[in-house]
Every structure is written in structure tokens, then in C-alpha cells.
């Protein structure tokens, strides 16, 4: 993008999709899906979240990730919606800027969608204006503190499309995200009683073992309750969790024999 501009970025994206089309995949046994949402630095930085995506993938999940562009766009969109909904008086230039910014995001997403549709597994995502309005039963879509309505909006949208496992990442002591993260869990569970919603607090002293214990509870609950209505391993197959535990047990037995 820096060297070749927008046209170069689009060409690079097309090449990436072409290379992905050459990768073989097997969808005969769909994995249960889990949505990861929360504070955006934790959400998108593997070092900060202890590579939670890789861990859940190793344990048999298909990851649904939130979109970084929605985090950037949220402020422009919410300001524009607040002006329209509450009839706020703002300078004309500022009103126009919010409107233009939203149009630019729409154009960029449309261009990316046209290219990404060349991959057979690509599903166009819900655009921000429709996504955030999913949260209205819980939090008005004009709310803009912390991650705003992105967390409830994402969860409700994917819950309506069959996902039943959700992980909310939040820094310990981040009050706005505790309101729109942990604070919405009770209402979410009332709306979707079979949903597994796990808020995870991160701080500098938290160990991965602590996080792993809570993640394993989510993994086992998904396996036992068969959430997400997909074919989980039957009695004749070992689940990824069982396989991992069996490998660890064999390794421990070998160590004991050597000693």
C-alpha cells in the first residue's frame, strides 16, 4: 500500500485470494464455532491474548474473529448516529465528515468483498450499520464507551446464525469494557440459554494456566451439550481435547519409565 497505493493493495489482495484457492481443505466434518470479541488490542494481538486462537483451534474449534475495521469505523458511525437520532447541533463540516467517512468505509468493504468472493468459503460479513443495531435490545446502538455496541452486536448476530460459543477478552479494571462485556452476559444467557459465554480478564500477572482452566471448561461444555448443532466426535473418535490429554499422559508415562 505504501509503495504502490490503493491499486497495488487490491492487486496484492487478489493474489492472496488466488493462493488461498490453491490450498486444499476438508469441510466434511465441520468444527464447532467460537466467536472471539472484546477489547481490540487483546483481540487482535496474539502476544497479549496468549495466542488464544491457536489454542482453541488445536482443541477443535473454528474461530470467528471480529473485524478491525469496525473498531476504527465505530467512532465515526456512532457520532453520525447520535447526531441523527438525538438531533444534536454540530457544525456542518463535522456532520459532512462523518457521512463521508462512512461512505468511504462502505466503498472499501464493497471492493474487498468483490475480490474475496472468489474463494468458495468466503461469506460476506454483516456491515457495521446493520450489525450494531442488533444490540438495541440490550444497549442502544448509539452507545460509544469502550468497545461500544460491537461486543453485544457481534454476539447477537452470530448467535442468530447458529454460533453458541463466545469468548469476551477484556483488560482487568477496564470499566467501559466490563459494562459492555461482562455486564451483558446475564441478558445474553436469558436470550440464548444454550449459549456458552466466557468473559476472560487479562492483567500482567495472569498466567496462561489460569486462562487455560477456564477455556477448558468452555471446551468441555461445548462438547457435552453439542452446541452450534454440528457433528462433534462420536464415541468411536477422540475429541481434540481427549487426544491432547492422551498424548500428555503417554509422555508422562515415558518420563517415568526413563527415570
Describe the predicted segments one by one:
Residues 1-259:
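An N-terminal assembly and electron-transfer interface module characteristic of large anaerobic redox
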